């Protein structure tokens, strides 16, 4: 695509790199598999390895991660230090929280997992095959295969609530 930066990368046959995508493998390299779709406005950092038919959409960043065949992260997401299985759907706004302030940790997402929108996966963590993560969840523990995992507070509505008023300037 137009206005792309592509360096230190291997792009597979039939892969499409949409405009304004930034791919730079530096010393670790980047691999984009056959028939993969990347961008627009995606960023593939060193160690990003995309399998065949992977979709990395707009404003998705991938660093030091492997995505297996057919995995999708279509928009507004971060995958760092992750191993992602086949046919995973990674929801908009979801991130891997891979850095604890001192060390980097890995996230493993097994085959056929669906991660809802706006999830935080706090590494080290492993999501079992075929599982579903409810949107808005922050996960800190491994999840079993085939399970629906939801980790968020229940919605509460407070009737007749008044917003604080602005104080007059002194």
Predicted ranges, named:
Residues 16-170:
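Glycine-rich hexapeptide-repeat left-handed beta-helix
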Residues 1-20, 39:
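Terminal amphipathic helices with adjacent charged low-complexity linkers/tails
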